[in-house]
Amino acid sequence: MLFRSPIAPAFLLVGLFGLSTILWGTLTCTWFGLSPQQLPQWLQALSIPVISNVYADTLWVLPWTPAGVGLTTAQNLQIFCFTLALIQLTVAHIKGALRNRKSLKMLGDIGSILQLLGIYYIVLSLVVNAQVFSFGLVISGIPVGTVAIALIGIGFVMSFVFANYEGSVIKSILSSLVNIVSVLLGVVNVFSDIVSYIRLWAVGLAGAAISATVNELASPMLGNFMFMIFAIVLLVFGHGLNMILNVLSVIVHGIRLNTLEFSSHLDMSWSGHKFEPFKE
C-alpha cells in the first residue's frame, strides 16, 4: 500500500484547495500576481480566453450586441460566479422537489426554480451589464427580458400556492397570505442570494491585488545584491501570508454559501447546540 495509515482529512482538504488553485490559476493565467507579459507563451496558451488575464483589456462582443458593446473579462468572471449560484441553488430545489415528489408541495419547488431562472437574468442586467442583458433583448424572436419577468411571476404564483401545502391547497394559500411579507421578501432574498456569490470573484480579486503589491515592493530590491535577501524574505512572507488568507477566505465563504444560501433554498436549518457557559 502506498499509505500505511489513512490521510488526515485536513491534509486532503488542503490538497484539494491546492489542486483547485493551480487549475484555476492555469485557466485564468494568474500566477503569483505576475502580469501575462512576464509569463511564457505556453502558459498563456493554457488559459481560457474569455476569463484569462491575458485578455483583460479585451471587449468580448456577443452575437446580439452592436459594435462597441460587449463584456470585459472581469464581467465574464462575474457571470461565472452568478452561473455557479444558479446551478447550486437550482440543485437545492431539485432535491427539495424530489423529497416532495409525492405531494403537490413539489410544485412550490418547481416555482422556486422558475424564479431563480428569471432573477438570474435580472442579476445579469442590473449587476453585470445592462446593455448586453437588457430587458428589451430579443434573440431569435424570443423576448428574453419578458420571458425572465414571466418566469418570476409564474414561479412566484406556484410558490405562493404550493410552498406550504400540507394536504389542502386552500390552507396553503391562507398560510402564504398570513406570511405575505415574508413571501414577498423571499423574492428579494433570491436576488440577494444570487448576488452573494460575487464574493468568490471579490476574494480572487483581493488575492491577486495582494500578490501584485508584494511583487511591486520586492522588485526594486532584486536589482541590488545587498537587498536581495530582504526581497526574497518579503516575497516568501508576502505570498505565504496571502496563501494562508486565501485558504481561510475560501473556507469561510464556502461555509457561508453552503450553510446560508444553499441550506435556506434546501429548506434545511442548522439547530446547533445551546450555549451553556461554565458547564463541563
Regions found by a protein language model. Give the residues of each.
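Conserved, carboxylate-rich catalytic/transport cores that coordinate ions
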Residues: M1-E280
